[in-house]
């Protein structure tokens, strides 16, 4: 499949995979890509498959000359589902912001190398962490 930008989707998936353990190929559809990060374990006592994590997820949409994004902070539960929740622990929020910024920089640099822009979605108004200058 070729995206609106003219780039083959399979090649983009490979490039996105090289950015780190963020892309969830099974949740990517058409010109939309899904990334997430399990940044902080809520409680290490349960067995690994039963653990919950604080983290973030990002949806990326390919358009003709740019990719747009929207992201959310929240809880990745033991069933493997994301829920948007407020996080009140300063250290956790700082870690989420750090990992999101690190990923955003890598993603932006990759897209720039392909002559594509990375911008917030037009309807993404409540951006908790400012990522674009």
UniProtKB/Swiss-Prot annotation:
Give one Pfam hit by family name.
Crl
Which keywords appear in this protein's UniProt record, sorted alphabetically?
Activator, Coiled coil, Cytoplasm, Transcription, Transcription regulation
Q: Which GO terms describe its biological process?
A: positive regulation of DNA-templated transcription
One GO cellular component term noted in the UniProt record for this chain: cytoplasm
Q: Gene3D superfamilies per the record? A: Sigma factor-binding protein Crl monomer (3.30.310.230)
Localization (cell): Cytoplasm
| UniProt keyword Cytoplasm, yes or no | yes
* Domain of life of the organism encoding this protein: Bacteria
InterPro entries in alphabetical order: Tscrpt_reg_Crl, Tscrpt_reg_Crl_sf
Q: Where is this region: Essential for activity?
A: 99-122
List each coiled-coil range: 90-111
Q: Does the keyword rRNA processing apply?
A: no
The main place the protein resides is cytoplasm
Its biological purpose is as follows: Binds to the sigma-S subunit of RNA polymerase, activating expression of sigma-S-regulated genes. Stimulates RNA polymerase holoenzyme formation and may bind to several other sigma factors, such as sigma-70 and sigma-32.
The entry sums up its family as follows: Belongs to the Crl family.
- Give the protein's recorded name: Sigma factor-binding protein Crl
Organism this protein belongs to: Salmonella schwarzengrund (strain CVM19633)
Q: What is the lineage of its organism?
A: Bacteria, Pseudomonadati, Pseudomonadota, Gammaproteobacteria, Enterobacterales
